[in-house]
UniProtKB/Swiss-Prot annotation:
One of its GO terms (biological process) is FtsZ-dependent cytokinesis. The gene is ftsZ1. Keywords: Cell cycle, Cell division, Cytoplasm, GTP-binding, Nucleotide-binding, Septation. It is found in: Cytoplasm. InterPro entries: Cell_div_FtsZ, Cell_div_FtsZ_CS, FtsZ/CetZ, FtsZ_C, Tub_FtsZ_C, Tubulin/FtsZ-like_C, Tubulin/FtsZ_2-layer-sand-dom, Tubulin/FtsZ_GTPase_sf. HAMAP family: FtsZ. This is Cell division protein FtsZ 1. PANTHER family: CELL DIVISION PROTEIN FTSZ-RELATED (PTHR30314), MITOCHONDRIAL DIVISION PROTEIN FSZA (PTHR30314:SF3). The lineage of its organism: Archaea, Methanobacteriati, Methanobacteriota, Thermococci, Thermococcales. GO terms for cellular component: cell division site; cytoplasm. Coiled coil: none annotated. Its main location: cytoplasm. Residues 353-362 have a biased composition (Acidic residues).
Length: 372
């Protein structure tokens, strides 16, 4: 058996060094199979809403997300002009005249409703829709729940991926975020919550501008990681129906990311992911988990260690799905991203809905920004 393994390794290594194109005659069945594959391919759309959401999709265009349509939505024409996307939608042209929502979620909501027809046309045919935004402002907080509700009613698996504002951004933005998150959770199948404050636990001396960039990058990694497990050829891919099974009516979800290049890199990366400050919940009751493993040369034994570690820490009845993406640029590093669904979060309590904040309720607050 060992000799067989050695022979395979030797042959594959030689083939990689001297790739040879094998000429295979094309048949009519091949053409038919290609058409079928194209027809059944999951159509995945990523919608960035508001300033932070548009920054996220702009970054996605830079790094590339295989097999996803990128849509940027904003009320601010000037900001939208700078964004790269497959499609841009300026919402609320009559209401805001392209000047933004002024940190008022109600204006963001009404702007989305005004542009409902254009938004519906953009979402037409989607199997899965990611709605991403930074909560706390006007456009993302107000418009994202409207867009998520549209997508879900149109039959798409709807996953919202959002950040919560830093405490230093003030009480008004915190109240806006609380209101928006409750509405978004009700409008989506799953809402993945990333508390920005937790980034400061990872790197307390991070400059504020860089902290926002890191928050954007985590949003990108979450959406890209899930999408490419479905769309990008990898060592182990996920079927769209696998993802649907975990994220359909998944409720609140949290994300953890870990990586290591040590001798025990697989276990260390898994431990880091589950102990990540971003994973700010007790995951023992999680109803589902999606594991994305990335590396240049992930071994079967390492994948098994990661999956077993995560499985031991969630509900025994939880549905756990996983995939492996080969990323040569990671070299000796293994990266593990874990998204746990169906968790109880202190960020969302479905009691009486918090009314949207107004100028009278939340006076301007002067915040002394600490040195980071």
């Amino acid at each position: 058996m060992l000799k067989l393994v050695e022979n395979v390794v030797e042959r594959v290594s030689a083939e990689e060094q001297k790739p040879q194109e094998i000429q295979v005659p094309q048949s009519s069945i091949d053409e038919e199979l290609k058409k079928i594959v194209e027809q059944i391919k999951a159509r995945i759309y990523v919608v960035g809403v508001g300033g932070a959401g548009c920054n996220t999709v702009n970054r996605m265009m830079e790094v590339g997300v295989t097999g996803a349509k990128i849509i940027a939505v904003n009320t601010d024409a000037q900001d939208l002009l700078k964004i790269k996307a497959h499609q841009k939608i300026l919402i609320g042209k009559e209401l805001t005249r392209g000047l933004g929502a002024g940190n008022d979620p109600k204006i963001g909501e009404e702007a989305a409703k005004e542009s409902e027809r254009e938004l519906r046309e953009a979402l037409e045919g989607a199997d899965m829709v990611f709605v991403t935004c930074g909560l706390g402002g006007g456009t993302g907080t107000g418009a994202a729940p409207v867009i998520a509700e549209m997508a879900k009613k149109m039959g798409a698996l709807t996953v919202s991926v959002v950040t919560l504002p830093f405490t230093m951004e003030g009480i008004r933005r915190a109240k806006n975020a609380e209101y928006g998150l409750k509405r978004l959770a009700k409008a989506s199948d799953t809402v993945i919550v990333i508390p920005n404050d937790k980034l400061l636990e990872v790197a307390p001396k991070l400059p504020i501008q860089m902290a926002f960039k890191v928050a954007d990058e985590i949003l990108v990694q979450a959406v890209k990681g899930i999408t490419e497990l479905i769309t990008k050829p990898g060592l182990v891919n996920l079927d769209f129906n696998d993802v649907r099974a975990v994220m359909k009516d998944g409720g609140v979800a949290m994300i953890g990311i870990g990586e290591s290049d040590s001798e025990k890199r697989a276990l260390e990366a898994a431990e880091q992911a589950l102990n990540s400050p971003l994973l700010d919940v007790d995951i023992s009751g999680a109803k589902g988990a999606l594991i994305s493993i990335s590396g240049a040369d992930v071994k079967l034994e390492e994948a098994q260690q990661i999956i077993e570690y995560v499985t031991r820490n969630v509900d025994p009845k939880a549905q756990v799905i996983w995939g492996i993406q080969l990323e040569p640029e990671l070299e000796k590093t293994i990266r593990v991203m874990v998204i746990v669904t169906g968790v109880t979060s202190r960020y969302i309590t479905f009691q009486e809905e918090t009314p949207e904040p107004s100028e009278e309720e939340v006076p301007p607050v002067k915040i002394d920004i600490p040195e980071l």
